[in-house]
Structure formats: C-alpha cells, structure tokens
Regions:
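Nucleotide-activated donor-binding/catalytic signature segment of Leloir-type glycosyltransferases, i.e.
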Residues: 230-251
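Conserved donor-binding/catalytic core segment of Leloir-type glycosyltransferases
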Residues: 11-13, 174-193, 199-202, 215
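A conserved mid-protein helix/loop that constitutes part of the nucleotide-sugar donor-binding site
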Residues: 22-31, 190-204, 353
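Short hydrophobic beta-strand element within catalytic cores of glycosyltransferases
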Residues: 286-293
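Nucleotide-sugar-dependent
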Residues: 267-282, 300-301
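Conserved acidic donor-binding segment of nucleotide-sugar-dependent glycosyltransferases
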Residues: 293, 305-315, 323-329
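Acidic anion/phosphate-binding donor-loop and adjacent secondary structure
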Residues: 130-131, 149, 153, 163-180
Length: 364
C-alpha cells in the first residue's frame, strides 16, 4: 500500500491513549496498527508513564493523562491534537462510540478533521436516540450486520461491516477445568448491562438444582463509585438466595480468569456503551468457554456457537444455565463451535484484509 512514493500516513483518532486504559476503541485501533505494517500510523500515547506497554510502531503523540482513562481532559486533548494532526495525514481513522458528545463532534467534522478521507469505526452506540442528531464522519464501519442496518437506516450512507479480531495464538483453546463449576459474568456497571440479570438467572439455576460458584468481574466507568456499586450487587445476590458467589473489581489477567471458569454468562438487556461484539465474549469463545448470551440483534452473528435467551428473561437464562452445567457433551460441542467461529470469522488475517482493502480504496 503506497501513497505516491511513500507509505500512507493515517491518524488513529481515539478518545484516550492507546497505551492507557483498556477499552474497545483502544483495542480496535491497536489491532489495526498491529495488522497493517505497510501504513505509517500516528497515535495518541499516555504521558507521563504508560498504563500498559505502548505499541512499537508508528508515531506517538503525547497526551497528558494521569491514568489513561478518557476523562474530559483526555477527550479535549484528543480533539485538539486530532484537529492538528488531521491536516498532516492522508487519512483519519476514528474509533469513536456514538455517545452524548458525538452529535456535536460530528457537526464540527470539517473544522476538527478537515476535508480529507475519514474512516469511522463505531464500537457501539450508547443510545439509539443519538443517531437522529449526527452526521456521518465519512465511510462508516460497523462491527455487526445488525448495527450496520441501524446506521444505514439513520442515513449514515456508506456503511461497511468489519468484525473485530482476536488472535487465536494469543487466546489458545483450553481444556474444561476440573472441579466445582465456576460461572463468570464480566461487564460494566451499566444500567441493564447484565449483572443483575446474571444474578437472578443464577438464583433460578440454583433453585433448579444446579451447583456452581458465580464470579462477577465488574469494571467501572469514569465518575462511578465502584465500591458502592459492587456492594449493591452483593446485596442483590444475597437477597436472591445466592451463597456461593463473589464480586470482583476489574480483572487485569483475563487469561488466568478464563482458565478457571467453565462458562460465560453475559445477558445484557441493552449493550449501552459496550461494543456490539464484546471482546470478553470473543476471548471466552476462543478459550473454549461456552457462552450464554441475551438474544440481542447484535449477537445473531454468533449463530449456533452460543446459547441465547430473551433479553431480561432471568428465568429462561437460568434454565439454560442449569441445563448446560448438566450436559457435558453439549458443553464440548459449544466449546468447539465457539473456537471454530472465532478462527473462521474473527481472525487477524480477515480483519487485516478488510481494513487494508478499505484503506486502498479511499487512498486511491
């Protein structure tokens, strides 16, 4: 991929540094950087210090950040530095969730991003009501067919579908753990984000005779009182009759966590700020951990590789949980299907080929 006599230069526009706090937008941008070596990328780096190891490629632009989390100062710097760098690159690739501030950003697109080509990968949509007040930044990329249809219906025009990637070598298939079953919920403290439904479903499964240990690995968002929210979940679990459970904070080592669990329980009523294709689900499937999800349109892309229950239906979700824990052969079938799905549809080669082709199209 060449632009004239040199490598094309692309700005990866994110709301926080690539070496800061982990998030879907940061993960997607990092994966694009890592899979397209023929591109000269410009990206935001946390300063001073790094919350995680910085990418070894590209041109870092320092963003002052204490913890690498996209607080208001980080977002403001990203917009300011992005406006400056956008005039010095061949293409801008934005990774921005459609949230409260995005409508204003989209209307200021000529001022902030110039008039060059823009790719906008949409990790998720906080509230579909925002879609009525935005303008497309350029060529839009959705993570799922469901979101692509929704964006096209909102006059986003040219919308492509490129699912996220996960490296099978980084997430090897693991054998089923021995011992007492462990069920994992991993998510954010979001309204209707699934934690409460997971607790109620677990209680339903226990009443049906299932025995297991429930782990809730919770992540907070900027401005939340995580300790208070964790305690509220403990109180809800106790009130539901659960005795064998624990509520953890953010888990840094997902490899170790998934190695010790039997399945993922992720039943959000709405995805809110989470990605259409949550990274946690891909990590679980790649590791050979079956998943029980809610029947949201975005999850249709997983097909028969997962179990799905009506969103918000704790009774049906709990019945599926009890059934799967009692069916080791079905567990094996789902574990194999999940791994195969990840390798066939979410691998790095497919991801790189699609973004590479899109870049070539827009830069030609």
């Amino acid at each position: 991929m060449r632009h004239g006599e040199r490598r094309p230069r692309v700005l990866l526009l994110t709301s926080s540094p690539l070496d800061g706090a982990e998030g879907c937008d940061v993960r997607l941008a990092t994966d694009v950087l890592g899979t397209l070596p023929e591109v000269d990328f410009v990206w935001f780096s946390q300063w001073p210090g790094h919350r995680q190891s910085p990418p070894e490629r590209g041109r870092p632009v320092r963003v002052l950040s204490r913890d690498g989390v996209p607080h208001i100062p980080e977002r403001a710097q990203s917009a300011l530095f992005g406006a400056f760098q956008a005039r010095r690159v061949d293409l801008v690739h934005a990774f921005l969730t459609v949230g409260r501030t995005f409508p204003a950003f989209s209307w200021l697109r000529p001022l902030l991003l110039g008039r060059g080509p823009v790719v906008h990968t949409v990790p998720g949509v906080m509230d579909t009501g925002y879609l009525n007040r935005v303008r497309p930044l350029g060529t839009t990329v959705a993570l799922s067919e469901s979101m692509a249809r929704r964006l096209r219906a909102s006059d986003f025009g040219d919308v492509r579908v490129i699912p996220p990637m996960i490296g099978p070598d980084e997430w090897p298939y693991l054998p089923r753990p021995k011992g007492f079953p462990v069920v994992l919920f991993a998510g954010h403290h979001d309204p209707n984000g699934g934690a409460e439904t997971a607790i109620d479903a677990a209680a339903e499964a226990v009443r049906a005779g299932a025995r297991f240990h429930l782990v809730l690995a919770m992540r907070g968002r900027p401005g939340q009182d995580n300790a208070m929210l964790d305690e509220a979940l403990r109180e809800r679990a106790g009130a539901a009759g659960l005795t064998d459970f624990e509520v953890r904070g953010y888990v840094d080592d997902m490899h170790a966590l998934l190695a010790g669990v039997h399945l993922l329980l992720f039943p959000p009523v709405v995805l809110g700020g989470k990605a259409d294709i949550p990274l946690t689900v891909l990590q679980a499937l790649a590791s050979g951990r079956p998943a029980i999800l809610s029947d949201l349109p975005q999850f249709a892309d997983f097909g028969h590789a997962v179990l799905r229950a009506p969103a918000g239906d704790a009774r049906r979700t709990g019945q599926q949980l009890a059934w799967l824990l009692d069916q080791p052969r079905s567990w094996d079938v789902l574990a194999d299907r999940g791994r195969t799905l990840v390798e066939d549809h979410f691998g790095p080669e497919r991801f790189a080929a699609r973004y590479g082709a899109l870049y070539r199209e827009l830069l030609s």
